[in-house]
């Protein structure tokens, strides 16, 4: 059984070499690493003088322009470049925590499980609120989620992250793969399709990657604007199971956490951050009512709109 890893890139730094070295030392070997690079000149600058292709002989590099990149479509392209039975989607800023990542991530892929996703651990520089959010979304206990969990988990049933997730090709092809065009959320849209088809989603807590961000309020606003857009464009997934209740639960949990750990001074910043996220989300869900200039100002992915909306 072959396992490939597919990684979209944009202006990668030297951390890419560390990531590739860690993938090369996994307990279960990776057959090929497929790099989907946006912006060829940045990649060429990175590897200049490194003998990159000599050192990493199992790597294939494909270049796309910034305008061509799409969260769903580019990943679909990567899957087509692979012939492996199982493929792992990763992002360039996700670092394997140990040599067992691929083994632990692919272990649940049996029976009705269509996709498994890894636990995300915070980086050393991670802010306290973001650290707690990692634990909220990626707890220490593994879980299999299916249609039977919709009544209790709601939208969380479909939660899956292409920061690090493994897919069974046979089921992927059966379901039609990732959505061709989306600004965000291609992983959850696929997971929802899998659950609705009778398959399950595995959260593999023992498969761990280091991945976190300390986003500014503006960045949070923009990311959540794009999140809202993705939900508005896919009502078949998100209308029946809105995410607002899950957001409210996280606010309550983080508030309790900060108070319990004598960090009440961080509450104001946290609430402002939440307001920025929620405002972005609401505007994104209603993007069709907004002027094109507003959409371009609010989004973190301007190229998406240049591809998909004539009035922007």
Question: What spans do the regions from the language model cover?
Answer:
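A recurrent flexible, glycine/aromatic-enriched loop bordering the glycosyltransferase active site
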Residues: 147-167, 183, 231
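Acidic donor-binding segment of Leloir-type glycosyltransferases
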Residues: 23-63
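Short, well-formed alpha-helical segments that are part of the catalytic scaffolds
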Residues: 12-25
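Short aromatic/hydrophobic "clamp" motif used to bind/position activated sugar donors
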Residues: 87
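Glycine-rich, basic loop-to-helix element that forms the pyrophosphate-binding segment
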Residues: 65-82
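Acidic donor-binding loop at a coil-to-helix junction in glycosyltransferase catalytic cores
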Residues: 183-190
């Amino acid at each position: 059984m072959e396992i490939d890893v597919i990684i979209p890139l944009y202006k990668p730094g030297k951390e890419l070499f560390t990531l590739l070295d860690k993938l090369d030392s996994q307990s279960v070997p990776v057959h090929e690493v497929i790099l989907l690079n946006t912006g060829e000149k940045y990649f060429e600058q990175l590897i200049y003088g490194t003998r990159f292709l000599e050192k990493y002989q199992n790597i294939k590099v494909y270049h796309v322009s910034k305008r061509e990149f799409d969260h769903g479509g580019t990943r679909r392209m990567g899957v087509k470049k692979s012939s492996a039975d199982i493929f792992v989607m990763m992002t360039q800023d996700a670092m394997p925590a140990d040599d067992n990542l691929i083994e632990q991530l692919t272990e649940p892929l049996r029976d009705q499980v269509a996709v498994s996703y890894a636990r995300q651990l915070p980086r050393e520089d991670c802010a306290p609120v973001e650290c707690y959010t990692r634990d909220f979304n990626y707890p220490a206990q593994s879980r299999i989620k299916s249609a039977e969990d919709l009544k209790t988990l709601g939208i969380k049933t479909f939660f899956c992250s292409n920061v690090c997730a493994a897919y069974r090709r046979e089921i992927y092809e059966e379901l039609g793969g990732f959505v061709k065009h989306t600004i965000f959320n291609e992983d959850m849209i696929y997971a929802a399709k899998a659950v609705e088809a009778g398959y399950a989603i595995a959260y593999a807590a023992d498969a761990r990657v280091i991945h976190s961000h300390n986003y500014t309020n503006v960045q949070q606003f923009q990311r959540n604007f794009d999140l809202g857009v993705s939900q508005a464009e896919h009502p078949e997934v998100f209308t029946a199971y809105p995410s607002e209740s899950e957001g409210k639960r996280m606010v309550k949990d983080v508030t309790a956490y900060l108070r319990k750990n004598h960090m009440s001074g961080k509450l104001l910043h946290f609430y402002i951050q939440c307001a920025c996220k929620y405002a972005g989300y609401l505007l994104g869900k209603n993007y069709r009512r907004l002027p094109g200039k507003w959409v371009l100002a609010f989004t973190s992915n301007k190229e998406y709109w240049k591809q998909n909306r004539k009035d922007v």
